[in-house]
């Protein structure tokens, strides 16, 4: 759940599943949210839960338009913390996507929210050259070479990251 997609959708980092309905949270505050007390998936007694939370910029989304093969979408960026949440509509063509960081990202996670696809990960120290490497968060597979289909062979810059034509 996040302020880009809203409290009604969830993603699991260990699964390739698409967005799914979440009914566990309500009443989002500036710095917190309420958990629905009667829900067994998020508030069962004697069960340990983890919830990851990052505050991007309070819910203000900056939009960008599609231009040729470069997807349109938007982002929320917290430049002080060094992360952004980016959403875009893919073109299945090689292009670039704005990230709003003002610095070169060292790690990028991409997930198709509308279909069952893997989490595709870039990390600047994955190998040489890192931009030609790929791994999937939701599998145990090793880092692989990918021939530019994921990151287009284009290193991230202070304003954009590259996308290839992979359908993952």
What are these regions (language model features)?
Residues 1-168:
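Surface-exposed molecular-recognition determinants
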């Amino acid at each position: 759940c996040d302020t880009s997609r809203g409290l009604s959708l969830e993603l699991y980092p260990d699964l390739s599943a698409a967005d799914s309905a979440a009914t566990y949270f309500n009443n989002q505050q500036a710095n917190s949210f309420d958990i629905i007390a009667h829900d067994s998936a998020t508030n069962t007694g004697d069960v340990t839960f983890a919830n990851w939370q990052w505050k991007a910029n309070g819910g203000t989304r900056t939009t960008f338009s599609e231009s040729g093969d470069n997807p349109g979408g938007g982002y929320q960026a917290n430049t002080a913390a060094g992360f952004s949440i980016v959403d875009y509509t893919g073109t299945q063509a090689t292009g670039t996507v704005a990230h709003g960081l003002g610095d070169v990202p060292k790690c990028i996670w991409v997930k198709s929210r509308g279909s069952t696809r893997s989490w595709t990960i870039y990390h600047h120290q994955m190998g040489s050259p890192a931009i030609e490497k790929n791994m999937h968060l939701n599998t145990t597979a090793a880092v692989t070479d990918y021939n530019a289909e994921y990151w287009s062979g284009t290193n991230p810059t202070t304003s954009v990251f590259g996308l290839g034509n992979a359908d993952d």
